[in-house]
Curated annotation (Swiss-Prot):
This is Chaperone protein DnaJ. GO terms for cellular component: cytoplasm. Zn(2+) 2 binds at C161, C164, C183, C186. GO terms for biological process: chaperone cofactor-dependent protein refolding; DNA replication; protein refolding; response to heat. The keyword Zinc-finger applies. PROSITE patterns: DNAJ_2 (PS50076), ZF_CR (PS51188).
């Protein structure tokens, strides 16, 4: 019996794109999959025909050979007995197309799990976070066993698992669907170790403290994460390692509070400075700066110093420094100072008090009005 044209099998034109081929194969395979047609020999044969056609047409070299010579291109050396050219494994093609629907993705040792990711909290002072720093850290982790180079075998020899036949996964029937899961016999490796390594006892990994140097970019803030690819735990049986995620945590500062790329601080000034005005020096992360306090400044007034905040780790623009003035009440007064203040206070009488302390007068008037309403 002659074979059907592969394009006809998938129902596509000869100029079909790779994406069109994949969609056509998906439709064909879904329709004829044995799990949907249990005991149907015709459906099983059609399913194999779909796989065979897709294996050829999805491979550029095979497709060119087929377009030039038809089925004759595979009559010598590519047969492979009843399964068509190359006899594709369902895990190679069908699993790649359908993911978890029928096979859980690409099967076998190729899909073996990677090493676990590792987290580390790095505490920094505000100055370190703003300027950037290189810091050495030590983390407990699993590294590849140097004795067996991660194989877990003392002599380097491994045996193919008889349960999963080296694929690392086994099929589990769930109604009309067949699911795949990690082989419980070989733990998903696809191989078994007859002579375990004496150092790692067959695990291929050993516990050890790893010392790393981390370059922290300038401008990081609490919650930012730095990813170091491949610096997590070593993968089992030589699979790729996980990643290391360093989470930044910035300690509280004695002077500054951070809000994004802006900084805030309080600047205490004396009553005389607030009343008469003055120029005061304030601390910034880059040194000192001056702010001019105008006469009659009240507590809470904000002064903005542009560009004196934090340089953004993302945009590289600079934030600002906001200085909030706090008028400080004098303490530990001498007798002379107390007398001077008493003389000063004596000048606040009548309308002069309302003129020189308008907020106090407004507050007193408000309290008086409240009690008048309560007692009326």
């Amino acid at each position: 019996m002659s074979k059907r044209d592969y394009y006809e099998v998938l129902g596509v034109a000869r100029g079909a794109s790779d994406e069109e081929l994949k969609k056509a194969y998906r439709r064909c395979a879904m329709k004829h999959h044995p799990d949907r047609n249990p005991g149907d020999a015709a459906a099983e044969a059609a399913f194999k025909e779909c796989k065979e056609a897709y294996e050829v047409l999805s491979d550029g070299n095979k497709r060119r050979a087929y377009d030039a010579h038809g089925h004759a291109a595979f009559e010598h050396g590519m047969g492979g007995g009843g399964g068509g050219p190359g006899s594709p494994d369902m895990g190679d093609i069908f699993g790649d197309i359908f993911g978890n629907i029928f096979g859980g993705g690409a099967a076998g040792p190729r899909a073996a799990r990677r090493g676990a990711d590792v987290g580390y909290v790095l505490e920094l002072d505000l100055e370190e976070a703003v300027a950037g720093i290189e810091r050495r850290i030590e983390i407990p982790t699993l590294i590849e066993c140097v004795s067996c180079h991660g194989s877990g075998s003392e002599d380097g020899k491994v045996q193919t698992c008889g349960t999963c036949h080296g694929r690392g996964q086994v099929r589990i029937q769930r109604g009309i669907f067949a699911m795949q899961q990690s082989c419980p016999h070989c733990d998903g490796r696809g191989t078994l170790i007859q002579n375990p390594c004496k150092t790692c006892h067959g695990a291929g990994r050993v516990e050890e403290n790893k010392v790393l140097s981390i370059k922290v970019p300038a401008g990081v803030d609490t919650g930012d994460r730095i990813r170091l690819a491949g610096e997590g735990e070593a993968g089992p049986a030589g699979t790729p390692p996980g990643d290391l995620y360093v989470e930044v945590r910035v300690r509280e500062h004695a002077i500054f509070q951070r809000d994004g790329d802006d900084l805030h601080c309080e600047v205490p000034i004396r009553i005389s400075q607030a009343a008469l005005g003055d120029t005061v020096r304030v601390a910034t992360l880059g040194g000192e700066a001056e702010i001019r306090i105008p006469a009659e400044t009240q507590t809470g007034k904000l002064f903005r110093l542009r560009g004196k905040g934090v340089r953004s780790v993302r945009s590289r623009s600079e934030g600002d420094l906001y200085c909030r003035v706090v008028v400080e009440t004098p303490v530990n007064l001498t007798a002379d100072q107390r007398e001077l203040l008493q003389q000063f206070e004596a000048t606040f009488t009548g309308e002069d008090a309302r003129k020189h302390s308008p907020k106090s007068a407004t507050f007193i008037d408000g309290v008086k009005g409240f009690w008048d309403r309560m007692t009326s």
